[in-house]
Amino acid sequence: MDELPNRERAPRNRTITLSGEERERYSGKLLTLTHSMAPGELRNRTIHGDLLAILDFLPRRFVDLLFIDPPYNITKDFGAATFRRTTEEGYGNWFSSWFPRLLAVLKPTASVYICCDWRSAGVVQSIAEKHLIIQNRITWEREKGRGAKSNW
C-alpha cells in the first residue's frame, strides 16, 4: 500500500492515520482477489483492490450493505491513477459504465449508500434510480474541505 504524505493537518481534522507498525499488521489481513470465491470465504474479510478489476470475482447476491465512494468529478491523483474532471454527461457515462455491473452482488434486500459531491448528486441519483428504489438522500454540512465556508 502506498504511504500517505506526512503533512500538517488542520486543528479540527479528525482523519485517522495508522503508524507503520499498524499498517504492516493490518495489511497482512487484507484479501486480494485474483479469482472467484464463495461467500463464506469473503465473510468478515476486508478486500483490497480496484473494484472494477475484482468485480467479476465477487459472488452474486451476497452483499447486504454496499457503501461506495467513487471519485468525485474533480481532478485528483489517487497514487498511480488520476481521475480527471469532466462534464456532467461524461461523469454520468463513466458512472453508468460500472455501476449496473455492481448490482449483481446485492441481495434483494440490500441497502446502498453512494457518496458524491453536490455537483454530481443529480446525475448519480438519476442513474441510481434506474436500478434502485431511492429512499432518502443524506446531505451534511462539512466544516472542512474545498469551499466549505462559502457552501453554507
How should these model regions be labeled?
Residues 1-152:
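Core catalytic lobe of class I
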